């Protein structure tokens, strides 16, 4: 039996601000924006090419805004993806990789999968890691 991850919730303070950031800056696609009860609203967006949605809203999680850390967005070319996101106004750190447990600027020298990263912060301080994974490499 297959088990597929459908939705990851992230805590935000301002639903409209988060929606604008994820749609306009990150380039995600809106799939749901609806009230679900008195004082509750759920928004779901999906990164291009992903089957897992990101959800946020009012009254849907008790987690503190900005407490989501280490969510990974994988891309086949981290240099191109970082440039695109920076151009769209996303606060994104430099591309870096680990050498002997220390961060070094730039992508992994051989561009090995799972080795190059860049940090992204949403308006609430939720931290994403952009990670290079080129599935065509095998």
Specify the residue positions occupied by each region the protein language model found.
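Acidic di-acidic motifs
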Residues: 14, 77, 122
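Core segments of cupin and vicinal oxygen chelate
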Residues: 2-3, 9-52, 80, 87
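N-terminal beta-strand motif that seeds the catalytic metal site of vicinal oxygen chelate
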Residues: 1-19, 68-71, 129-138
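Vicinal oxygen chelate
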Residues: 34, 73, 82-138
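Conserved short beta-strand elements that form part of the metal-binding/catalytic scaffold
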Residues: 29-68, 75, 93-94, 112-113, ...
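Generic signal for short, ordered secondary-structure residues
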Residues: 1, 63-64, 103-104
